[in-house]
From Swiss-Prot:
Biased composition (Low complexity): 80-89, 183-257
Residues involved in GTP binding: 426-433, 474-478, 528-531
GO CC terms in record: cytosol
Matching Gene3D superfamilies: P-loop containing nucleotide triphosphate hydrolases, Translation factors, Translation initiation factor IF- 2, domain 3
InterPro entries in the cross-refs: EF-G-like_DII, EFTu-like_2, IF2_assoc_dom_bac, IF2_II, IF2_N, P-loop_NTPase, Small_GTP-bd, T_Tr_GTP-bd_dom
Designated name of the protein: Translation initiation factor IF-2
Source species of the chain: Bradyrhizobium sp. (strain BTAi1 / ATCC BAA-1182)
Amino acid sequence: MADNNTPGDKKLSVPTKTLTLKPRVETGTVRQSFPHGRSKQVVVEKRGTKRRVGDGAPDAPHAPEPVVAKAPPPPPPSNRPSGPRPGSSQRGGSGVVLRTLTEDERSARASALADARVRDMEERRQAEEEARRRAEREAAERAEREAAEARRKAEEERHRQEEEAKRKAELEAKKRFGEGEAPRPATAAPQQQPAAVTAPARPAQAPGRPQGAPGSRPQQIGTSARPGGAQPAGARPAAARPAGAGPLGRAPGVAAGPEDDEGPRQIRRGPGGAARPAPPPKTTHKPGPQKQRGRLTVVTALTADDVRERSIASFRRRTQRLKGHAANEQKEKLVREVTIPEAITIQELANRMSERAVDVIRLLMRQGAMHKITDVIDADTAQLIAEELGHSVKRVAASDVEEGLFDVVDDSTDTEPRSPVVTVMGHVDHGKTSLLDALRHANVVSGEAGGITQHIGAYQVTAPDSGKKITFIDTPGHAAFTAMRARGAKVTDIVVLVVAADDGVMPQTIEAINHAKAAKVPMIVAINKIDKPDARPDRVRTELLQHEVQVESLGGEVVDVEVSAKNKTNLDRLLEMIALQADILDLKTNSDRPAEGTVIEAKLDRGRGPVATVLVQRGTLRVGDIIVAGAEMGRVRALISDQGETLQEAGPSVPVEVLGFNGPPEAGDRLAVVENEARARQVTSYRAHQKRENAAASISGMRGSLEQMMSQLKTAGRKEFPLVIKADVQGSLEAILGSLEKLGTDEVAARILHAGVGGISESDVTLAEGFNAAIIGFSVRANKEAAALAKRNGIEIRYYNIIYDLVDDVKKAMSGLLAPTLRETMLGNAQILEVFNISKVGKVAGCRVTDGTVERGANVRLIRDNVVVHEGKLSTLKRFKDEVKEVQAGQECGMAFESYGDMRVGDVIECYRVETIQRSL
């Protein structure tokens, strides 16, 4: 900026400002922006303040402010009478002053400061909260460590005490049984050892009685009497035996035999000689009993350690004697309780009775029945045989393996409240899935092909007011999924009937009402789409009266709620009504028991294998449980919730995806947890056997009708459209098969060669090739090998995601097999006036067209006396010797027929055209 002095002005002037020391100032220019797009370049000064001794505290530093270039600065106020102000600055002739803040800037600054203070307080509060949580966490961890250390010390102390007690017990046992410490080496001469160490002192021996006389007291073992009284040098000292040991180291408490009381066997030297103990017998350790080798003498027989055993010949003689006695004795008959199933072989029955199969066959022969041991007899015959042989009978059925799987009565004291299961039903496109999306804050409709629900889905929603969880089951609404809706009604507690306010009651709405009545569950009517201009909720209530559904507003007991899934209107009231209805039902179950549930949907996933959507109804399903559903079994490998989270367990009313089945079960099968794999195999084998028997019975029952059908096919020429169908889930496959079955007529029908769940494989392509069939994949794809094989063999594979498109295409293809319809269109009539015989042409009829027109090449009938005598084509049509295409009424012409010449005067010729009309189903 320029200073205030005008160029060329030479006048001297005294500055009006107070003289101050010029501080060190740093200046710069910036462009200041104002509202409404205005801007201004200003000078910015940066001052440094000094603090002097004796001055008061300097003012709080201010942020640098914009400077006005032209306006002179006002004199700064000073409290001191004289002297320069420490913080003042002097701008020598520049005339630059600081601009005061505007009201908006001041308010903005104040609000910024207030926001900063609020943020500071919030950060300080969060820091304090975090410090408190950290302190609590550290205290909990410290307490846990102390508890773990205390447990460890207690465990170590317990182990130490157990080891000490064990060691003491071992020492005591060693002391008692003479297996304690090793003998100490002798430190003194054996002859200086006292005579009796372990025995009490006895009176002196009577004089004149020789040592070793019959009446003398036997000596101790430790001091054997030798002629001189000396002990051998290598003898074991008496003190080597443990204290408390009896003679020869016998354990205390063991009674000594007569030989022990008299001491060791002694050898007499003579009448007055001293007796010495006999040498100990030699002990030989042999690996086992052996036969006595060499010559058997008295000495060897007495000194042999081996115990004589019975010879083989003697053992055989004894066995023969026992057999002879046993043959003479009358055996006591054993009466057994024989378990008899519905069918059993003769050999198995004899084994269970511990009887010979020959006796059973002999008994049957006396009754006039000839059988072999491999023949199967029924339970009644087996019971008669067992009772005839004196046994008791216990009848069992094959279905007994299912006893105790389901419907076990729980104790009322163990039950607890559970979440309600709500099924949403209604007509197609009435907003069932959209209503669930609004409740779940999700978007499932966009994920469904064509925006329609083709799978049954289960979700959990938490009520905002009460916090209780509600399980919703979404069912398809169109006509093909009747079986799915029936399954949904069976497992539900409450049915929410969704009716569109602009559409009213439709066929699937009526079907849903019937399902709810058959399941005997309460119903809540949700009148949806009330946000539309043509919505008429009162008309819906009136139409429901025709089907015996009377809402509360019309004096009935059925709750009705007007909702809008699009605008999320009255959704809280709908949840409130559901919770109220659940409280009225008082839903309780026992969660501490093996789980029971129902398979809502099942599919075969390529990456995860068989996957079943299961609604747990009772108990708790855990990872690792052995489960049975229908004819399939498995062990739970994983539980996945509707949100995609992996769970370790699922309680009552919780829908989960279960991984671990051997194969995909059928939708609607009941699931149960069994105790072991053996029980699971019994149940599944029985159910598979029942399934095969039912299939065989249905085939055998259809034999007569099948023969009749084959004869009808030969006579009527009924055509078949072969198909191989693979779908993603069992429910969709059922819907497709039901829809295709309805397309069949007396002339054409769909023949399903194979229908299954999973991707299209090479075996499917091979089967389709053998019958020249088409392959249909619904929400599945063919693998690489199957696609290559189909392309190589010319087999068509059609993929669909919407069931309507699949049914329409099959309907068109089957319509192509229908024979077309022939429709006659009358053109005109002519009467023969004269018949001419022309050479090289044949007979030609001269006719007059009475009505309509006659065209060349059209079909004709020759009618004589109201009887058709010929049908053919008109080969020649002339008028005055000219070939013409047609002749109008009232004109005369000449006609000739193809390959026919028997025409007479007065015959009538009908001319008509045949149109071919393609038929459709």
